[in-house]
């Protein structure tokens, strides 16, 4: 990919390390992007919308409605009007406790019960997207599972379990795991689907180059592992 425009909140200096020595055309603050996009659609051929407020401990619903729901709707509408393909990040957090399984069949989306406002905001957009009659010429939503890999240093407590575990082992020689609150799982026996970020990027690029059908897909390894196995 060439002529890449990076859009983010660049006031967080720690993020600068993520794109040092990377090839891109320029950066643009997220607060300016929608206006720029509306005025310059001819400069855009494809949109990856991966950014979001992902803090699962944040309970200010207005923040999620603003950044995750309404902002994404605006990008969708601009891509639709200007016939520009869109790939966006949904989340496995939409599945909640998994009462309805983890199948990415779209008929299950209205049934899902996320556990926090972050998951709600992602599911709310998914529900909205599948009801639209007007859409980008190509659109794909990927439900990211537990992504880990390089450049998580700016994410603080929201970095992956693998990132935190690695640093604990490096500093203390051991890793401290969460106690299980589900009687069906022993301590350390909780399951997560961990997916390496570079594998995820390969799939995102595949979505750019392929004729994948429009819709919402799971994006994980396809195999859950326990925290004990991870440790």
Question: For the regions a protein language model found, what residue spans apply to each?
Answer:
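Catalytic helix-loop patch of NAD(P)-dependent Rossmann-fold dehydrogenases
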Residues: 66, 70-74, 81, 85, ...
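NAD(P)H-binding glycine-rich loop region in Rossmannoid oxidoreductase-like domains
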Residues: 30, 36-67
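Hydrophobic "lid"/C-terminal helical patch
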Residues: 129, 204-208, 231
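N-terminal Rossmann/SDR dinucleotide-binding element
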Residues: 1-46
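Conserved active-site region of classical short-chain dehydrogenase/reductase
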Residues: 69-73, 198-201, 205
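Conserved short acidic donor-positioning loop in nucleotide-sugar-dependent glycosyltransferases
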Residues: 9-10, 92, 222
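Glycine/proline-rich active-site loop of Rossmann-fold NAD(P)-dependent oxidoreductases
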Residues: 123, 135, 147-163, 171, ...
């Amino acid at each position: 990919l060439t002529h890449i425009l990076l859009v983010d909140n660049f006031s967080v200096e720690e993020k600068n390390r993520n794109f040092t020595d990377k090839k891109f055309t320029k950066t643009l603050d997220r607060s300016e992007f929608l206006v720029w996009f509306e005025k310059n659609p001819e400069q855009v051929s494809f949109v990856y919308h991966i950014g979001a407020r992902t803090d699962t401990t944040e309970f200010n619903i207005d923040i999620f409605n603003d950044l995750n729901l309404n902002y994404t709707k605006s990008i969708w509408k601009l891509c639709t009007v200007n016939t520009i393909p869109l790939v966006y990040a949904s989340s496995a957090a939409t599945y909640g406790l998994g009462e309805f399984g983890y199948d990415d069949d779209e008929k299950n989306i209205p049934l899902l019960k996320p556990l926090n406002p972050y998951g709600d905001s992602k599911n709310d957009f998914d529900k909205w997207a599948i009801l639209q009659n007007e859409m980008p010429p190509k659109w794909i939503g990927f439900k990211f599972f537990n992504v880990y890999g390089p450049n998580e240093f700016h994410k603080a407590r929201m970095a992956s379990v693998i990132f935190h575990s690695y640093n604990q082992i490096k500093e203390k020689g051991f890793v401290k795991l969460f106690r299980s609150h589900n009687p069906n799982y022993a301590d350390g026996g909780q399951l997560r689907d961990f997916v390496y970020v570079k594998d995820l990027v390969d799939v995102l690029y595949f979505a750019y180059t392929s004729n994948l059908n429009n819709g919402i897909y799971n994006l994980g390894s396809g195999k859950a592992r326990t925290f004990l196995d991870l440790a």
